[in-house]
């Protein structure tokens, strides 16, 4: 029963061309067996297979394979699909990292400071940047007004420090920052936008209406949604605006709808105490408005459809994106992966949300000009509808 090492030395030929052909037909078959609509949205799926297969002998790279396969998938006019394949031959990094400071620059004077993003590197005590300061140099390199400003805030690798030279009233001064990633800055901009909406609703409703925005339908955002609505600041308010505009989806619609559907069914109290409601958070007893727009997609559309079917309140905004199929995926032996849009979503009267979306009860658009000038027609209508109901 002793182990004996056996040495094996062998070689085999690897043909990327043959691999690409196998991957093409295997991924096509996976879609053929699992696509949610048995009529393939009226397309002849076998015909498309044969049409795009003509190009297989001429494919010389994975990028070309990705291109023709995803083009073929595009013939289905569907969402939640995609084919991806990466190999060692593509393991070359040509990208750059953003060295973001949180400084907002003026649109007409692209090297002049117009504002500071809250809690960003430039918002730290001691930086003392002001509106009107002019950027002169980055890491000692003088800026050229004729070049793209972002050139100076990008690098092949992330740096722990960036040095800016600015001018104020004819005097130059230096400021050093620990830069942030572009993703971090996007999150801070989102936080500012949400806070501005919250303050806007508080001001217009005199603190009578709770406001919560969900940017996606994931577990973390669900937890934040519940924490916000059970906090004393929001739970004691008379109504709710749930904002699903720009929501990119996930899979927590059932939890959100269940929470919003809670009704008060009893009161209880400790001896000589105050009566308290059961359940503690009966939002279904209050007026609720759901905000959606043309960028509310995927599970946000499931949530909106359920909200409408359950009669939880009014939906205000524009039609949703029409981009909702629940999806799995399969991997190939080389590590390639393709998504499988397999579970269609339908209203109780049979409408396909992938092609129909969800229409609002009250249509209110929001133009690019509104966004530039700070107008809030959708929030204004939501506040108006709720206050009218509260004042009846």
Stretches with model-predicted labels:
Residues 21-25, 29, 46, 50, ...:
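Solvent-exposed, polar/charged alpha-helical surfaces in well-ordered, non-transmembrane soluble domains
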Residues 32-51, 102-117, 208-211:
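PDZ/PDZ-like groove recognition
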Residues 31-36, 40, 136, 140-142, ...:
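Cleft-lining beta-strand/loop regions that shape enzyme active-site pockets
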Residues 79, 123, 137, 234-237, ...:
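In a subset of proteins, long, contiguous C-terminal domains/tails are tracked
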Residues 56-108, 171-197, 383-384, 390-392:
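Extended, small/polar residue-biased N-terminal targeting/export presequences
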Residues 312-371:
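C-terminal structured "cap/appendage" subdomains that terminate the fold
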Residues 94-145, 343-344:
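PDZ/PDZ-like domain segments forming the peptide/carboxylate-binding groove
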Residues 1-83, 344:
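Sequence signature of WD/YWTD-type beta-propeller architectures
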